[in-house]
């Protein structure tokens, strides 16, 4: 029951109607008996500054931040987590310190961590947008053998690769056209697809790599979670490769935000169960 002592956290974006975060977080608060409530707020870009200042005045404890505010919100914060600063985007705010974090990348690392480690692995990242950027900086921190950024717009891939090198987190990064992905996948340990290929409603898109071009030791992560089994993961299963589902990244980035706000260990099993129920899985 919400009362005068309930701590409010939430989501700001535009739009936010279809977010799966509220049920996941509210189930976690209930599981741990925490007097918190998670509420989505639809904030238009022109109202972002007043929303952040108003939230602080209202003693809101934290926000998740989604499109289109992840970059613009940074200018209204007092502090940035070092890796969020490198990524150049924030998806979590802790109002206690007016500090921004980016938990997208750690969500991906933990999802893959269920089946293998990043250390000393050859990794192919498809795409060079915001999600790729967040994930690539976290990958670089885990000491992989190599990171190959492949993108349709090769200049975007080059820019991300250069930023990774300049961060001093890794030297072992290069870039190329996504058209050459088959050659890279043959030597890869992990393939991460950050592109929207196969995302609902375009579930019949052609997979960026076919089963015949994969090998059985490959770990394949698609960050798309709707549908659960994307065209790429379907090909991975056909090839005997290990699939890592997009729902796991959604789960772990949420768990990381939960821990930043509450200081408590997230009940990941309850959060996953709720997420699966919400997604009808």
Swiss-Prot record:
GO MF terms, alphabetically ordered: NADP binding; shikimate 3-dehydrogenase (NADP+) activity
What is any Pfam family matched here?
Shikimate_DH
Q: Where is the active site?
A: 70 (proton acceptor)
Q: What is its EC number?
A: 1.1.1.25
Organism domain of life: Archaea
Query: Which GO BP annotation is one of this protein's?
Result: amino acid biosynthetic process
| Entry keyword set | Amino-acid biosynthesis, Aromatic amino acid biosynthesis, NADP, Oxidoreductase
Q: Which residues bind shikimate?
A: 19-21, 66, 91, 104, 225
What the record says about family reads: Belongs to the shikimate dehydrogenase family.
Name by which UniProt lists this protein: Shikimate dehydrogenase (NADP(+))
């Amino acid at each position: 029951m919400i009362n005068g002592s309930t701590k409010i956290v939430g989501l700001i974006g535009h739009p936010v109607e279809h977010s799966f975060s509220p049920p996941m977080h509210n189930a976690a608060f209930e599981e741990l008996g925490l007097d918190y409530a998670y509420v989505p707020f639809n904030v238009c870009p022109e109202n972002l500054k007043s929303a952040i200042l108003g939230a602080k005045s209202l003693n809101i404890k934290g926000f998740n931040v989604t499109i289109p505010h992840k970059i613009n919100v940074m200018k209204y914060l007092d502090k940035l987590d070092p890796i969020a600063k490198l990524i150049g985007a924030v998806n979590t705010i802790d109002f206690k310190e007016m500090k921004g974090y980016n938990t997208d990348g750690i969500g991906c690392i933990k999802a893959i961590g269920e089946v293998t480690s990043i250390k000393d692995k050859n990794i192919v990242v498809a795409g060079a947008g915001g999600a790729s950027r967040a994930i690539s900086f976290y990958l670089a921190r885990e000491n992989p053998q190599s990171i190959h950024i492949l993108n349709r717009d090769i200049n975007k891939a080059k820019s991300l690769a250069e930023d990774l090198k300049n961060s001093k987190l890794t030297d072992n990064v290069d870039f190329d056209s996504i058209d050459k992905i088959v050659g890279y996948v043959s030597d890869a340990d992990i393939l991460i697809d950050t592109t929207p290929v196969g995302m609902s409603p375009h579930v019949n898109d052609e997979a960026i790599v076919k089963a015949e071009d994969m090998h059985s030791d490959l770990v394949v992560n698609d960050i798309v979670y709707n549908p659960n089994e994307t065209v790429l993961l379907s090909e991975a299963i056909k090839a005997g490769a290990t699939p890592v589902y997009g729902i796991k990244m959604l789960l772990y980035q949420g768990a990381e935000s939960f821990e930043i706000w509450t200081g408590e260990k997230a009940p990941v099993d309850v959060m996953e169960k709720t997420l699966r129920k919400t997604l009808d899985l």
